Amino acid sequence: MTLWVLGLNHQTAPVDLRERAAFAGDALPRALDSLRTLPQVREAALLSTCNRTELYAMADDPQTLVAWLDMHAPGLSGYLYQHRDAEAVRHLFRVATGLDSMVLGEPQILGQVKDAWAVARAHGALGSGLDRLFQQTFSVAKRARTDTRVGANPVSVASTAVRLAQESFARLNESTVLLVGAGETIELAAKHLSEGRVRRLLIANRTLAHAQTLATQHGGVALPLTELDRHLAEADVVFSATAAREPVVTRVQVEQALRTRKRKPMLLFDLAVPRDIEASVAELSDAYLYTVDDLERAVEDNRRSRREAADQAEAIIDLQVARYVETLQANERQAPLKRLRAFGDSTRDELLAKARQQLSNGKPADEVLEQLAHALTNRLLHPPTAALRDAALNNDLDLTSAADRLFPEKPGYRHPPVATPIVRTDDANPAP
């Protein structure tokens, strides 16, 4: 089995394609259940955020994974990147550290990777291979953030949106801000807004209790999402980030709100993928809409300023990838020995139990021992005997040579190690 990662992100695919590729809400567990039915896939995990959808899998053939993703969202194949084995390990380490994020070093992605691991494990989609990889990923990401400043003073998409709002409204503290949703992105936006102060903070969410919790923490007013129409016109700035599959803020709603506001400008930030705000809202006069793709350009300055710390983190990741791959290769080299030992132990235990039963039934000890020795010899030597017979028929000299070393003619004899040529350095110019 090979480790594969297939995915798309903000660098390879536009937002409309990313929103079709996203696995929101209950779609993620269902997708994992679907992957588990594929005979070519042994283990799988899905990472789905506003900026990326990635499939991590232990599988024989990546085309099976490509076909599965294309069935989920037709047209993805031309936008997918693909990594295997060591490069797949490197990719996950970089993602979890925030080196592959729109906002370099963002802290939220590590939590999202942990969520992907937890969901995959809860649904039985993880095996020892991916589980070990994710555990190592968490350790590497923590070290990279501790040993470098890649995560210092992190700038998130939410904080970037708040900064743009502050630049657009010189007196944001005299404005009304509406937050739609109550997830992590909206929590971050609320935190940054409360630090800068706003005149009034409205928080609308499908689950009112979640909105109330956030409102209590940041001095806002909680609203059920069903009352969005009534309060949209009050908002000078709107931040929206829900997990809805369809837009929660429509063009019709914004048009009505602008009429009520008597064409007073409204600034809207759509921080969700799939998008929360209908794209055609950007066509309206006095409505200024930013999507996550627009914000990528706004955070490029931050990316440049943190490149030195990122280079240090990359060096840590390079070292950790090499160590991880070395450990995997060592385990692979030990695997035949472990299988051989397990085969010998299980054979011994099975035949010994049978011999003890025969003794307890009164069978003569000499006869039992004779049968035990004969059975052990046959059972243990049958696999190598069959393999050597095939090797002789197929002229497999490598296997027959290995057998000579494993089973020498003289019992107890050990073959000498393979000689290594010695290069003399004391006679650099020998006489002709």
Curated annotation (Swiss-Prot):
Catalytic center residues: 50
**Where do the segments described as Disordered lie?**
408-432
InterPro entries referenced in this protein's UniProt entry, alphabetically: 4pyrrol_synth_GluRdtase, 4pyrrol_synth_GluRdtase_dimer, 4pyrrol_synth_GluRdtase_N, GluRdtase_CS, GluRdtase_dimer_dom_sf, GluRdtase_N_sf, NAD(P)-bd_dom_sf, Shikm_DH/Glu-tRNA_Rdtase
Q: What's a BP term from Gene Ontology annotated to this protein?
A: protoporphyrinogen IX biosynthetic process from glutamate
Question: EC annotation?
Answer: 1.2.1.70
User: Which residues take part in binding NADP(+)?
Assistant: 181-186
The record places the site described as Important for activity at: 91
MF terms from GO for this chain are: glutamyl-tRNA reductase activity; NADP binding
Q: Which UniProt keywords apply?
A: NADP, Oxidoreductase, Porphyrin biosynthesis
Superkingdom field: Bacteria
Keyword flag Metal-binding:
no
Q: Does the keyword Transit peptide apply?
A: no
Q: Which reaction(s) does the protein catalyse, per the Swiss-Prot or TrEMBL entry? A: (S)-4-amino-5-oxopentanoate + tRNA(Glu) + NADP(+) = L-glutamyl-tRNA(Glu) + NADPH + H(+)
Ranges annotated as spanning the membrane: none
Q: In which pathway does it act?
A: Porphyrin-containing compound metabolism; protoporphyrin-IX biosynthesis; 5-aminolevulinate from L-glutamyl-tRNA(Glu): step 1/2
Give binding positions for substrate.
49-52, 101, 106-108, 112
Q: What HAMAP family does its record include?
A: Glu_tRNA_reductase
Describe the subunit structure: Homodimer.
Q: Tell me what else is known.
A: During catalysis, the active site Cys acts as a nucleophile attacking the alpha-carbonyl group of tRNA-bound glutamate with the formation of a thioester intermediate between enzyme and glutamate, and the concomitant release of tRNA(Glu). The thioester intermediate is finally reduced by direct hydride transfer from NADPH, to form the product GSA.
Please explain the role this protein plays, according to its UniProt record: Catalyzes the NADPH-dependent reduction of glutamyl-tRNA(Glu) to glutamate 1-semialdehyde (GSA).
Q: Which NCBIfam families match?
A: hemA (TIGR01035)
Comment block on domains: Possesses an unusual extended V-shaped dimeric structure with each monomer consisting of three distinct domains arranged along a curved 'spinal' alpha-helix. The N-terminal catalytic domain specifically recognizes the glutamate moiety of the substrate. The second domain is the NADPH-binding domain, and the third C-terminal domain is responsible for dimerization.
What family does this belong to? Belongs to the glutamyl-tRNA reductase family.
Q: Tell me what this protein is called.
A: Glutamyl-tRNA reductase
Q: What is the lineage of its organism?
A: Bacteria, Pseudomonadati, Pseudomonadota, Gammaproteobacteria, Lysobacterales
Gene that this polypeptide is encoded by: hemA
